[in-house]
């Protein structure tokens, strides 16, 4: 049957060469699930805690403590349970941890087990993962938000914003959307090289040129879109992840690249001007994670013109999301499985968002793996949007390739989300 008979955790490496947790789950009927846990560089203060060893190995970043929790306490607690009862399994691990932020056993330990259990249950029923999680109604292929220029803590340059994304809103399918993105990515590489900029890539596969402002980065992207024969705003839109918490201090936003300091009102005005000047349809973390006043002002100013996404603000946490909904802050939530630490809590956050009319965007982390779980999750939740990096690095492409496969599997039932921003 679908009874858990063994759980094996191990320490492996992520896309940055840092340790992460991998978990194998075996069921009584021979079914098997394996999951790898991602890790962020730009992390919100309110995220669940990933447990690191803090010793000399891997400069303190080892995860042997989290692995020991998987192979010890968690196995003892979950052995003999039914893998199909995801909520009960996740709740049992949360209770076992006993802390509000999963700090004792580690969110990385809990998440690895939670995702591997879901994969094993899907395998036992001979179902694709997206179908097992999402049921028969899972059929929407997400519009990809492709991060082709990296800045902030994701790159060694002076750009303060963390991500500049192209969004193929006018593509007829996810396969074609990925083609659009790849063509623009390579066109951008050529333009950067011709202009004398380095074309090395950052953590998420995007280029990391020594630009000093957001306008400069967007202008290069716009030129690359046009060079490929696509129409900005009609076929390709633009998205930003400001990651504003990273340059927010004492009530102001400090732009090292521009050498400017903006107060809350000036930050809002600056973002509003960018939306007016370019086909920007989504802005993530335009204000800092605890700048609720700024978030409210930003939402009131451009929330009807642009998707306002809370990442560090909401950290995939249903309670923080409910607070934001009550305050009228933001209109979308970024969903990162490791911010909360279990699959069932992740799905709950998506449900809370959808019930309130907020959009949800399934997202990777800067420290990724070859695990393509989030591609299936995006389809399972019918959320219509996914962030999984640029068109380089196999840890990013694993998700894009899985979306192509899922679209093929769904056949005539598949529907590409496309332009959901209007």
Swiss-Prot record:
Keyword Ribosomal protein set for record: no
Catalytic activity: (2R)-2-phosphoglycerate = phosphoenolpyruvate + H2O
Keyword annotations: Cytoplasm, Glycolysis, Lyase, Magnesium, Metal-binding, Secreted
Residues annotated as binding Mg(2+): 241, 284, 311
Annotated (2R)-2-phosphoglycerate binding sites: 162, 336, 365-366, 387
Pathway annotation: Carbohydrate degradation; glycolysis; pyruvate from D-glyceraldehyde 3-phosphate: step 4/5
Cofactor info, note text: Binds a second Mg(2+) ion via substrate during catalysis.
SUPFAM superfamilies: Enolase C-terminal domain-like, Enolase N-terminal domain-like
Compartments reported by the entry: Cytoplasm; Secreted; Cell surface
InterPro entries registered for this protein in UniProt: Enolase (IPR000941), Enolase-like_C_sf (IPR036849), Enolase-like_N (IPR029017), Enolase_C (IPR020810), Enolase_CS (IPR020809), Enolase_N (IPR020811)
Gene3D superfamilies: Enolase-like C-terminal domain, Enolase-like, N-terminal domain
Superkingdom assignment: Bacteria
Gene Ontology CC entries for this record: cell surface; extracellular region; phosphopyruvate hydratase complex
Transmembrane residue ranges: none
Cofactors demanded by this protein: Mg(2+)
Role noted for this protein: Catalyzes the reversible conversion of 2-phosphoglycerate (2-PG) into phosphoenolpyruvate (PEP). It is essential for the degradation of carbohydrates via glycolysis.
Family to which the UniProt record says this protein belongs: Belongs to the enolase family.
Name of the molecule in the record: Enolase
Organism encoding this protein: Bartonella tribocorum (strain CIP 105476 / IBS 506)
Gene: eno
